[in-house]
Amino acid sequence: MKMKILSLSAAAFSVALMFTACKKDNSASTDYTSEVSTQSDDESRFSAESDAVANDANAAMATEAYFNGRSSITVICDATIVADTVSNPRTLTITYNGTNCLGNRTRTGVVTLSIPAGTRWKNPGAAITMNIQNLKVTRLSDSKSITINGSAVMTNVSGGLLINLPSLQSIIHTVTSAGVTVTFDNNMQRSWQIARQRVFTYNNGVVITETGTHTDGTTTGIAEWGFNRFGNPFTCSILEPIVVRQDCNFRIVSGKIQYSRPEITASATFGLDVTGIATTCPGTGSYYLKATWTGRNGNSLSVILPY
């Protein structure tokens, strides 16, 4: 089953739109609009590309035949995959070739998936290590790029393969990383951490429910955290599960996220109508989000935006 999976990036990008659209809070001594907008865009791209790596890994691991002697596999439009079925651990090497088949970005670099010999990805608790080497993603609209290096672990908590999802109740995956290096277009490097859980179910199509699994003090549901390109700490938390449905064109149908910095907190609630009330799938029409943010002086503002 080949699926287009919308990531948390749509949520973060919407928060970025909110900050660029709103007026400066003149009662605060510092205007954080530019920094928060840039950070939201950075986080949205990182979230999208780390999710894309996990999606590509799932595509490559989708059938056990990939470890039965085929030396070269093509299931990703801008990459080739080479399988090593002899070494321990077994590996699948994904090499991105920079082809513009995705329409909005190009990718170069290598991601190596490794799994211990004898371990089957379909089994409960099976884990693969995703080693990311110079994965450079260039956005075609403005030629800006990010480069990702480091490793993450994807665990098939429940067992099962996504190609068999219609016959299964659910499949649960987690993606974690203790530190992935992100290089921004200004050559600034930062280390970000990841802690996400994705639950795949089938209800008139694929349903993906994403949550954050990291806790820091009293803050729970953290999906990503670290220091932004300006050197300031941030967290991106999922306050209410982000739900994406295939029968709604793989769009976010509900959920709430929060982006936090010491000086600013912003949140966005999804799956609303134009009045801000939760709604069912609007078909080809727009969903709306309600964005709320608190300035340094403690005042609260909100806006309803389409997505």
Model-derived features: positions:
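Bacterial N-terminal signal peptides
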Residues: 9-16
